[in-house]
Amino acid sequence: MITPSIHLYGRPTGAEPHWKDLTQVAGRSWKRVTHRLYGYLSASFDLSSDNMSESEIIWLYNSAIGCTIRELTAGMTTWEGLIWDMRLIVGGVQYVRTLDSEWTHNKVKAVYSSDIGLRTATAWTENTDASDEYGEMQYIDSMGGATAEGAAALVARRIAEHAWPRSRMTGSVAIGNRSSGVSLQVTCVGYYATLNWRYYTANTTAAASSLISTLVGLSEFVTAGRIETNALSVRANSSDTERQQRIGDLLTHIIEQGDTSGNVWQGGVYAGKKFRYEQAPTDYTYALQRGRLLTRGMSEPAPTMVEPGFLARNLDAPMGYPPHGTDSAWDDPAIGYVEQVEYSTSGGLSVQFLGAEAQMAILQAQIASGSLPRSTNKSTNKMRNA
């Protein structure tokens, strides 16, 4: 089995020089997820004074937020993102640095009610030093009734407080607890997350693939890769003062609409920060047999090379024929659509199917408890790696 390596690079606002090979220390706890709607989605790893010097851990905490992380397999990028959140524990006290948009934003404006039924927007205010270093992170604060002076004051306060991913002490501290040792929890996100650093504030109707290209073109870091033509008419209903929508959210909404023939589409940001948009496959790519994932040639792929958005035939399924009147692989009970792939150095490869059974069970439970559904679980299959 090919073992991946984990590497730290500089920030994407610069030339991204190679900083450090983290394979020996981060590789022990490395875990990452790729999804058919987002591409490279998330990753995480832990460091402690058991496997890295305390000074190096603290240096990473102080220096690496917003830096690029890559998983390489045989020299090829098989996951890529940036360090999003870091949680350092020293002497029992937790310190946090994060790029979460509620905590870090360097370009801000406010939208407020200046009169009954009248929404007004301030001009953008930007800390260019922060955006030059980390990328432009827009934030629109939606207010209630306010004066122009009050809205401007809120914008100024947000820029002063949140333009930089500063370190903050969080949580509780047990007084008298003489904790020793240093640990660091690192959470990474794929570059799809940076698409939500910018808003789209135009009212546009266009073909799906055309609007996808337009939206991706507004990104600071992501560029268009393979964009298949989709003539479905879609709409972005935004304005400067109403219904401001983040670019990433709009892209996901378009992908989920599919096409005029009812086909499933998929997309996301992959290697090289390239955005893909394509129709989901109509035939199976892999087979499942006794916990193993196999190619159609019955060989096992490298676990880190497997990407979501494929059909898999279960060779152990009790039913192997589609219902009468259809020859679509999507209707074959022995074939499932894999929407998410997870790989970890400790657990290997697992795939998650898009399926209605688990969704219905959750929906029934939420109806019974009186709560509204916000998310759904899907069935997960664990792959055994040879």
Which positions does each model-derived feature cover?
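Short, basic/aromatic beta-hairpin or loop at an interaction surface
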Residues: V33-D46, A280-L294
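Charged- and aromatic-enriched interaction segments used to assemble
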Residues: G92-W103, S113-L293
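Acidic, low-complexity/disordered segments
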Residues: M1-H7, E16-K20, V93-K107, S114, ...
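Beta-strand-rich assembly/attachment modules of structural machines
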Residues: M1-H105, S113, V173-S209
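Glycine-centered tight beta-turn/hairpin loop motif at sheet-sheet or coil-to-beta transitions
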Residues: A74-M76, L293, D331
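C-terminal or late-domain output modules
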Residues: L47, L218-I227, A287, G297-P301, ...
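Secondary-structure transition/turn motif
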Residues: L47-N51, T187-T194, K274-D283, S299-P303, ...
